[in-house]
Amino acid sequence: MDDAVLARIDIKKRKFLDVKADSAAMRRAKKEAYFQYIYHTVGIEGNTLSLAQTRAILETRLAVVGKSIMEHNEILGMEAALKYINNTLIDKYGDISIQDILEIHRRVIGNVDPVEAGLFRRTQVPNATSPVLYLQ
């Protein structure tokens, strides 16, 4: 990066830090980032719901016609995990434990795969959006 790019980044950072944490603009930005985070996180594993559909599920708790229950549950599980993190771990003193991670995992996939939720995997699971590469 050259100095001009770094200077622009610094200006934007200062403008961002000037926004009051309790302002309407900051609340809207946080809410939008929340929806986008959930949308992109479940999308990595192949969820086909759009950002607008994801937002609608989270805001209304109503199902989207033509989409699977599993896709809905992935979104609701991710939301449950984020609520758990924000309500219990955000102010936790000390390291996050293996048990904390398993509790997050239990919430993320609890409605999708309740048998495996909160446990270590015993099998390899390939990423839905990437081809499997084998060593020759």
Sequence positions of predicted segments:
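FIC/Doc superfamily catalytic core
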Residues: 1-136
